[in-house]
Amino acid sequence: MSNETFLIPIRQNNDLSDIALNELRMDLDEHALHQRYYTDIAYLAGNSRKYSLNSVQTVASPLIGKKILFLGSSVTFGFGALGESFVDYLWKRDGVAAIKDAENGTTLVDEDTYKPNDSYVARFREELTESQPDVFVLQLSTNDANQNKKLGKITNQNFDTKTITGALEYMISTAQARWKCPILIYTNPYFANPLC
């Protein structure tokens, strides 16, 4: 089934926003087998129409107009929520000028997962020239642990971006020096894995 045909009933049944539809379209262009996964999760209670981004109202918020860069993988993308993540809710509800740089399955470490330059480090380097955020939000990826990436060691310089620690050190120190903005880091751990 074509991606466009596949998306018609999901959009209608789940009242998907245009943002989510575009996110899913781009993901399916790269990962056609995700159709099966999206079919399964479309019927989960948290993906019902009542939680659609279309039903969210904007409120007066101190975040209105704040440019926030979100760098991450599936959680930031909204993979389990049909492309509507917390980033989209902050945009709609609080008026955040969100930059959502998220690709499913990617890692912090500077190694290509699915295509060239899809790691957090590679995408971060692109954002350095394109963005000047008020806040930088970084998702700690569980994909690094799941793919047995090296943890690495804490250093003061010469960060080894082929390790989890080095990639984090590089992005944090570079963002602090370049953007001089608050940096928020979050994760969603798998409790059976000590790295997550």
Summary of predicted features, one role per range:
Residues M1-L71, V75-L82, K92-R93, T129-D134, ...:
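N-terminal secretory targeting modules
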Residues Y37-Y38, Y43, Y51, Y89, ...:
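Sequence-level detector for tyrosine residue identity
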Residues K67-L69, V75-N158, K162, P194:
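Conserved SGNH/GDSL esterase-like catalytic core that processes O-acyl groups on lipids
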Residues G95, S141, S173-K180:
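Sec-exported extracytoplasmic/periplasmic mature domains
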Residues F124, L168-I172:
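Generic structural signal for well-ordered alpha-helices
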Residues C181-C196:
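Substrate-gating cap/lid alpha-helix
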